[in-house]
Amino acid sequence: MEMDLNNRLTEDETLEQAYDIFLELAMDNLDPADVILFNLQFEERGGAELFDPSEDWSEHVDFDLNPDFFAEVVIGLAETDGGEINDIFARVLLCREKDHKLCHILWRE
C-alpha cells in the first residue's frame, strides 16, 4: 500500500471524520443508555482527542501503523470541560492518506 505524505487529512479533518463515523455508527454499537448519556453530556464534557496509534491496535489489525499515515481518535467524556477524556465511548483508528479509506473502531463494552 503506497501512500503519499502530501495527500493526508489534516489533524482537524481526521478528528472531524472520526467523529462523523462515530455518530453514524454509535446507535448500532453502543448500549442505548450510553448513547443517551453521551448525547446529554457531550456539549459540556465531550471531546475527541487525536493520538498516534497505540500499541494494542496490533491485536486487531495486521498491518504497519505508521503514525505518519494512521491516527487514533479517542471519543468520550471528561470529568470537566477541557479536561482529559476518561470515559471512553470509542477508539477510532483512521488512515489519514486520502486515497486509502480505512477505519477500525473499538467500542465501549
Swiss-Prot record:
Pfam families given in the database record: DUF440
Gene3D superfamilies found in the cross-reference section: dsDNA mimic, putative
SUPFAM superfamilies xref list: Putative dsDNA mimic
NCBIfam families: PRK05094.1
Similarity comment text for this entry: Belongs to the putative dsDNA mimic protein family.
Function: May act as a double-stranded DNA (dsDNA) mimic. Probably regulates the activity of a dsDNA-binding protein.
The protein's name: Putative double-stranded DNA mimic protein Ent638_2296
Organism of derivation: Enterobacter sp. (strain 638)
